[in-house]
Swiss-Prot record:
One of its GO terms (molecular function) is carbohydrate binding. Keywords: Lectin, Repeat. InterPro entries: Jacalin-like_lectin_dom (IPR001229), Jacalin-like_lectin_dom_plant (IPR033734), Jacalin-like_lectin_dom_sf (IPR036404). The keyword Transport does not apply. The keyword Transcription does not apply. This is Jacalin-related lectin 17. Residues 2-148, 151-293, 295-445, 452-595 form the Jacalin-type lectin domain. Residues 1-23 are annotated as: Disordered. Belongs to the jacalin lectin family. It comes from the Eukaryota.
C-alpha cells in the first residue's frame, strides 16, 4: 500500500488549483519542469504503469520559462527515491527542485536563493510513484506517494544439497558475520542485522561442530555497509563452501576458510547487501544475497552566500579545471563522463589575463577522485559587497590511485577535507558569484575491482592440482630445476601493499633455486613463456623451461634451453597469481590475470 507524503511549500490551498496524480502507478518515467526567476511555472510527470507509459495532465503554464527534463530509465531498474526543493515564502513559490534516483542525482532545476526554505520528500527504503500539490502563478506546493522498493535477489551460489534457509530482505544492513570452518569446509554462517535502528540477531545456518569461528563486524554507525561476497566451493560430492570473504564500502575481510575449489561472487554494482539466503545442513552448501540501493553521500563546506549550483551526479570525472587569482578560486570547470560522453559544467567567472588556470586529468574509468582538500580565507575587500568575505582559497584533489594534484590557488590556514570512505566523487555543487564561496561533492561507492580471469594451465596431466589464488601483483619468483626440468616453484605476491608468501610447490634440488625479483610497484608481469615434453622417468609431460616477461624486461631462461611451445598471457592484462599441477616435477602451470589499470 502506498504512503502519502503531505505537500511541502504553501499548505494553505485557498485560491490555488490543487492537483493529484494518484498512487496507482509503478514508476516515474520522465519529469519536465519549466522555471523562471520567480519560480517553477510548470511541472509534468510521465508515469509507468504495467510497463506502459502514462501521460497525465500537467499543472502550470507550459509556455513560460526554460524547459528542463530528467529521464528515468525504468527498464534498467532505475526509480525515483527523493525530491529536494526550495520554497520562497515571500513570493509563495517553489523556486528550485532536484531529483534523486537509485542511480544518480539530477542537476538543480531552478534556483535556491537566500531566504528559500529547503524541503525533502523521501522515505528510506521506498520509491516515489506519484505526486500531488497546488499551483497558481507558480508551483506553490509539492507532495508525493511512496511505496516499498523490491530488493534485488541474487540466487544462491555454491554446491548442491542442504536445506533451504532465508533471512529475508527487510533489513537496513548487516552488522556482524560469524563463520565457522571444519574438516569438510564451512560448517555454518550466521548474520546479525540492523532494522529500524535495532539489532536483529540471526540464526546459524549449518551445524555448530568442532572448528574455528571467525567474526567480521561492520560499523553501520560509521556508514559502513556490505557490498560483495567472494567464496570457493567444492564441485565434488561434498558440495560444501570451502572459504568466504566479505567486502564493505570501506574494507575487505580476511579469507575465512580456504581458497580451494570453484570461485563464486555475489555483487551488484552500486548496491549494498541487506539480507542472505542459501542452503545448509551439516555444512554450508550455498549462499545468495538480497541487494538494495547504496546511498549517495553529499558533503559541502563554505558559506551560504551567493546562488547555489549543483551538477548532480554522473558516472565519473575526466578533467577538473580550476581558475584562480591571488585571492581565491574564481571558477570551477568540470568534464564529467555520462555513459561515455563528456558533459561540461562551469561555475563562476573567467577574466583573463588576471586569472590562472590549473588542470587535473583523471584516468576515468580506472581512476576516481576520492577526496578534495578545501581551504577557506577571508577577503578584506569583497568584490561583491552584499556577499560574505569568506571564499574558497585553494583546492587539492586526491584519487583512488593515490595521486595528488597540484594545489590550485593560495592555501589558507582554515582547512576542510571532503571525503567519504570507500567512495569516489561523481558530482560537484557549490555557491559562486565573483568568487567561489562554497564547494561540495556527491560521493558514491567505488565500483568493485574488475574480476580476475583464470588462464588455463599448460603441460601434462600428472601430479596434484594447486592454486595460489589471485592477488594484486607478483613481487618475486623462485624456480628450482633438475636434469629433467622444473621441479620447484614458489611466488611472493602483493595484496593491499603487504607481502604474501605463497606455498612451496615441488621439492628443491641440489642445483639450487634461482630468483627473479620485480621492481614493485612499477613493474608487473604480463606473460609466461615455456615448454613441456615427455622425459625419461615420467609418464606424462613435465615443464622443461620457463621465462617471464614484464612491462619493463624479460627474465633469464629457467630450466633447459628448449623451444617454447606455450605462452600464458591475455592482452591488456597483468598476471596476479599462479596455479598448476605438481608431483616430483612441475607438470602444469597456469595464471590468474587482471586488467591493467595503471
Amino acid at each position: 500500500m502506498a504512503q502519502r507524503l503531505e505537500a511541502e511549500g504553501n499548505k494553505n490551498f485557498k485560491g490555488k488549483s490543487k492537483w493529484d496524480d494518484g498512487s496507482d502507478k509503478d514508476d516515474i518515467g520522465k519529469i519536465s519542469v519549466r522555471c523562471e526567476d520567480g519560480g517553477i511555472t510548470y511541472i509534468r510527470f510521465d508515469y509507468i504503469k504495467s510497463g506502459q507509459p502514462q501521460y497525465n495532465t500537467f499543472p502550470g503554464n507550459p509556455g513560460r520559462g526554460i524547459l528542463q527534463t530528467f529521464d528515468i530509465n525504468h527498464k534498467n531498474d532505475e526509480h525515483l527515491e527523493s525530491v529536494e526543493g526550495y520554497y520562497d515564502p515571500k513570493s509563495d513559490a517553489i523556486k528550485g527542485l532536484q531529483f534523486k534516483t537509485n542511480m544518480r542525482i539530477s542537476e538543480l532545476i531552478g534556483y535556491a536563493n537566500d531566504g528559500a526554505t529547503k524541503f525533502s520528500l523521501a522515505v528510506e527504503g521506498k520509491k516515489i510513484i506519484g505526486f500531488h500539490g497546488a499551483y497558481n502563478t507558480y508551483l506553490n506546493s509539492l507532495g508525493a506517494y511512496v511505496t516499498w522498493i523490491v530488493p534485488t535477489k541474487l540466487k544462491a551460489k555454491g554446491g548442491k544439497g542442504g536445506k533451504e534457509w532465508n533471512d529475508g530482505a527487510d533489513h537496513e544492513g548487516i552488522t556482524k558475520i560469524y563463520v565457522r570452518g571444519g574438516y569438510e569446509g564451512l560448517q555454518y554462517v550466521k548474520f546479525d542485522y540492523i532494522k529500524d535502528g535495532q539489532q536483529i540477531y540471526g540464526s546459524p545456518h549449518g551445524v555448530r561442530g568442532r572448528g574455528f569461528t571467525e567474526l567480521f563486524e561492520i560499523n553501520h554507525l560509521d556508514k559502513e555497509y556490505l557490498i560483495s561476497v567472494e567464496g570457493y566451493y567444492d564441485e565434488g560430492e561434498s558440495g560444501v563452501i570451502q572459504g568466504i570473504q566479505f567486502k564493505t564500502n570501506i574494507r575487505t575481510s580476511e579469507l575465512m576458510g580456504d581458497n580451494r575449489g570453484r570461485k563464486f561472487s555475489l555483487a551488484a554494482n552500486g548496491k549494498k547487501i541487506i539480507g542472505f539466503h542459501g542452503y545448509a545442513e551439516k555444512n554450508l552448501n550455498s549462499l545468495g544475497a538480497y541487494f538494495t540501493t547504496s546511498p549517495f553521500t553529499k558533503l559541502e563546506v563554505g558559506t551560504t552566500s551567493a546562488d547555489l549550483w549543483d551538477d548532480g551526479t554522473f558516472d565519473g570525472i575526466r578533467n577538473v579545471y580550476i581558475h584562480y587569482d591571488g585571492d581565491a578560486v574564481c571558477c570551477v570547470e568540470v568534464d564529467y563522463d555520462n555513459k561515455g560522453k563528456v558533459e561540461k559544467r562551469e561555475h563562476g567567472i573567467m577574466i583573463a589575463p588576471f586569472i590562472e588556470r590549473g588542470e587535473f586529468v583523471v584516468d576515468y574509468p580506472n581512476e576516481f577522485i576520492t577526496s578534495v582538500e578545501v581551504t577557506i580565507s577571508k577577503q578584506n575587500d569583497s568584490p561583491v559587497p552584499s556577499l560574505t568575505s569568506e571564499t574558497v582559497a585553494s583546492l587539492t584533489f586526491k584519487t583512488s590511485k593515490g595521486r595528488t594534484s597540484s594545489t590550485f590557488g593560495s592555501p589558507a590556514t582554515k582547512k576542510f577535507v571532503l571525503q567519504s570512505k570507500g567512495c569516489g566523487v561523481v558530482g560537484f555543487l557549490g555557491r559562486s558569484s565573483y568568487y567561489t564561496y562554497a564547494l561540495g561533492a556527491h560521493f558514491c561507492p567505488l565500483p568493485p575491482l574488475p574480476d580476475g580471469e583464470k588462464v588455463e594451465a599448460k603441460g601434462g596431466d600428472g601430479g596434484a592440482s594447486w592454486d595460489d589464488g589471485r592477488f594484486d601483483c607478483i613481487r618475486k619468483i623462485y624456480i628450482g630445476h633438475s636434469e629433467m626440468g622444473i621441479a620447484f616453484v614458489k611466488f611472493l605476491y602483493d595484496k593491499d601493499n603487504k607481502v604474501v608468501v605463497g606455498d612451496d610447490h615441488g621439492s628443491k634440488t641440489l642445483l639450487g633455486v634461482d630468483e627473479f625479483e620485480l621492481e614493485h610497484p612499477d613493474e608487473y608481469l604480463i606473460s609466461v613463456e615455456g615448454s613441456y615434453d615427455v622425459v625419461d622417468g615420467s609418464e606424462s609431460e613435465v615443464i622443461r623451461m620457463l621465462r617471464f616477461k614484464t612491462n619493463m624486461r624479460t627474465s633469464q631462461l629457467f630450466g633447459h634451453e628448449t623451444t617454447s611451445n606455450f605462452t600464458l598471457q591475455k592482452e591488456c592484462h597483468k598476471i596476479v597469481g599462479f596455479h598448476g599441477k605438481i608431483g616430483e616435477m612441475l607438470h602444469q602451470i597456469g595464471v590468474h590475470v587482471l586488467p591493467i589499470t595503471d
